[in-house]
Amino acid sequence: MIVSVVPINEEYVKSIECKTGERIHVYAGIKETMDVLPEAEIVIGFIKANIIEMCSSLKWLFILGAGVEMLPFALLEKKGITVTNVRGIHGPQIAELTIGMMIIFSRRLNQFMRNQGKGYVTYRVLR
């Protein structure tokens, strides 16, 4: 059984179900999942150590973020649970944002936009 403890876009759910042949049980939060978590083989979303303890069938924990440093790795290793996350999937977007911000600040476009909003007009040459 695949259980998501966080809401997921219905389009993504259908795509995953189609590719895996498994139904994904999506819940709005951890409280709603307490009855089904002991049977879950895959959990999507962050769960704490006390919840991991009660997941007797858990084989895979999929974290929808990059940060996993707060996970109880000793417990996960003892139970043989695989952990994956989404580290690195936004690399190109972050690089584009960084370049864009460098251009904005080097050319003082942020100041220009504030001045434009106030009705200021300057004819100074940008360097």
Question: How would you label these PLM feature ranges?
Answer:
Residues 81, 87-127:
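Phosphate-binding beta-alpha-beta segment of Rossmann-like dinucleotide-binding domains, i.e.
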Residues 1-84:
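An N-terminal-biased, well-structured beta-alpha scaffold segment characteristic
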